[in-house]
Swiss-Prot record:
Belongs to the polyribonucleotide nucleotidyltransferase family. It comes from Christiangramia forsetii (strain DSM 17595 / CGMCC 1.15422 / KT0803). One of its GO terms (cellular component) is cytosol. Residues 702-750 have a biased composition (Basic and acidic residues). Residues 556-620 form the KH domain. This is Polyribonucleotide nucleotidyltransferase. It comes from the Bacteria. Keywords: Cytoplasm, Magnesium, Metal-binding, Nucleotidyltransferase, RNA-binding, Transferase.
Amino acid sequence: MIPKTFKEVIDLGDGREISIETGKLAKQAHGSVVVQSGKCMLLCTVVSNYEQKDLPFLPLTVDYREKFAAAGRYPGGFFKREARPSDGEVLTMRLVDRVLRPLFPKDYSAETQVMIQLMSHDDEVMPEAMAGLAASAAIQLSDFPFECAISEARVGRVNGEFIINPTRAQLAESDIEMMIGASADSVMMVEGEMDEISEEDMVEAIKFAHEAIKVQIEAQHRLADAFGRKEVREYEDAPENEDLVKKVHDMAYDKVYAVAKAGSSKKERTDAFASIKEEVKASFSEEELEEYGDLVSDYYRKAEKAAVRDLTLNEGIRLDGRKTDEVRDIWCEVDYLPSVHGSSIFTRGETQALATVTLGTSRDANQIDMPSHEGEERFYLHYNFPPFCTGEARPIRGTSRREVGHGNLAQRALKGMIPEECPYTVRVVSEVLESNGSSSMATVCAGTMALMDAGVQMKKPVSGIAMGLISDGDSGKYAVLSDILGDEDHLGDMDFKVTGTADGITACQMDIKVKGLSYEILVNALKQARDGRLHILEKLTDTIAQPNADVKAYAPKMITRRIPNEFIGALIGPGGKVIQELQKETGTTIVINEDPVTEEGIIEILGTEQEGIDKVIAKIESITFKPEKGSVYEVKVIKVLDFGAVVEYMDAPGNEVLLHISELAWERTNDVNDVLKLGDVLDVKYFGLDPKTRKDKVSRKALMEKPEGYKERAPRDRDDKRGSRDNNRGRDNRGRDNRRDDRKPRENKD
């Protein structure tokens, strides 16, 4: 039986469409949709168990995978099977998770999975832009307790015109690339990179994307209505004990307020809050704690949050005593590590990052191999967040999704400032050594200084700041916080990271936890962020004002040369013999790539000693040397012969040519040794290929004046000098008429 399907179509306004369909695939999932644009198809399924887990959080898993079959390709590697997710897939998972998670009830703890799979790929469609739409549409068809439909859209700007979900080719021309996640009435998530745009341009891009998202949300509602909405499931939630809430609040609020107002350090504050919590718990009997001890802890956290927020809203004072627009104390240092190619330390309050830079060849580029995108990154950044940076001991596993996301944000913040002509592959690694908020922005600042310390000629330095928000919807009060602490991130309503140069924004990431954030607040936050960024930027440039003129003495120097493709084989040699011996002899690394546009070979020479690099350059010039007809070259005699001398071009050692004895002087030369000796250096003129010998012809005498009275010898007439040599035996006069006819015929022996 053919299943009944339901479908809605979204018009993007430029001839492109996105369709959402359900009813055909994965019907045992609690909700499933296929989202399609062009030939690109995403399957999204959602499932949530009916059993609640005893956890203080929602065990939500968002999984996004791109199947290689979708692009008609095989997975790389030995096993030929999709394995762990790529960084690109992890980033898409985070984009979707950050919008979905806040919309589930806080006391909902059933295991929930959202799985999104790329089933068919279209080179003109970037699939991750539709992942949020697919996830929300599938949830709308389920019975999950989910607050409202959302969607996500990518926005670009080409020639001043905004575009929704641009192609990869359009993005290459765009000065904005942002992913926006929103409900119908609120922007919830923003992440992207820009080419030093203004705060006003950024707000306009967000507004444009939000209007497109509203259209996508309407399509989800139409699909759910046509399919038939399910009744929201009931789940076992813990009712609030109002008497207990009041009791805990009355005991803790004033004490927490006083500690928060004291402006103490993170450790002192944490210890003080822990003592207050223990005092509250000690006021209850063992029987009471056994009955609702977890509730006491929950209600204490509510009282603590309320006290800290009220302090900031009422008095404009923050946990560490700063004003709302004040940035923590900063100190910086460069060239800290003696053996790396570039290093820096950036410390802001109790957050510290140590950044290192490593320079390499194109062979060291980060390879991207995804069904939706293949390529390489010549600049990339890795972010590490070890447990000791927060004073904790926990299992050390692989790179976390958070580390991937924070590293990607810092990379996007900096990469636009790496000049295209930079010959190196550049890797930045940020080690977070202390963390009390905004470690990703510390990474941006440390990365900037380390790059300049390494001699990477950045266009402009970049700084970053994390902004926060505390608001009261009832009273309308709000406070925008500059350079937030970890506790302010946890207790606040917004985490908004902004990076940029003195001239504009290069990257941003925003997560909003409250509904109805006005654009007025967003504009104010951006203006306050700019002031903070410029203050931090001044601290960076006080430490290192501009990039070092050259790389470190122990860092490799990179020289790039281009040669015609026809010489690549000669440089490599049979079985790679020439290039391998050259690398061994000079202590360099030589990488050869081909430019398909110019049809040239690009030779990268990497070495720590200039002498070795110079030897490689000389060898390349020797191999690719082509003398020009009519030009004069300096040569050196390397061998004397009876009929001339073998000379070597001084500009291309190893390139030899015969200087014939007749080209030494206008007068007759009887002995070459009378004119030249081994090691002599002289000038010769190049005449191209000799038509008789088909070998290169050079002349010394062509650069000399002819002696007075010199006469050219007339060429000899070979026939006149030697006479007729066939003696009437030529082919045309063989005397056939004079043949004897008296010869006897040959006898037949048979």
